[in-house]
Amino acid sequence: MNKIRKLAALAVLPLVATLVALPAQAAERPSCPAPSKAEVRRSSADKVDKPARGATAIKGVRVDHIPKGFTYGQVIVNKHDGIVEYGYQWSDDRDDASRRHRALWVRVVCWPKATSLAQLKNAPFNIGSFSGDTTTTKVGDRRVLRQKGDGALGAGVYTGWVERPGVVVTVMASPPLVPGLTKIIKGIRL
C-alpha cells in the first residue's frame, strides 16, 4: 500500500509543479514592456522594416488598429535618465512635407515616477514632450492628454496617457490619420 501511495504522489508532482510555477512566472513578468537586445541594436543601426511590421511590432504591446498604407517602419529605443522609451514608427513613402503623408508613432515609456496625467507635461522625454497647449479627453476608459503636433514631431496630433503606474503610452498621428486616432488608441493593449 505504501508503494502505491508513493507512486501516486510522484505521479502528481509534475502537475503540482506546473500549477505552482505558473503564478510564479506571472509575478516575474515585467510591468513595462522592454526592448530586447536585438531591438536596441536595430534602433541604434537605424534599421528599416520593409514592409512595416504589424500589430505586434512592439514586444509586449498590441496595436490592434493600424491604418493601411504604410510602406516601412522602424523600431525606436532610447534609454536615458532612468527611463526607457520603446516604440515603433510606421510611415509611407510620401515626403514629410506632403499633407497626405501618413505616419504613426506608438511608444511605451518605462518611467518609474509616472503616476498621473499631469506629470506628462514635465516628463523627461527626449522627443515628444507635452509642452504646448494640451487638453484632457476621455478615450474609452483612458484619460488622455492631447496636443497639436509641431516641431520634431511634425504635423498631426500627439496624445499620451499613464497606462498604469510607471508605464506611459504616447501616440503621434499625422493629419490623414487623425480622424481614426480614437480607434487607434482604443486598440492599444499592453
Placement of each model-derived feature along the sequence:
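Feature captures outer-membrane beta-barrel proteins of Gram-negative bacteria and organelles
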Residues: 160-162
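Secretory targeting and sorting signals
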Residues: 1-28
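Surface-exposed amphipathic alpha-helical segments
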Residues: 165-190
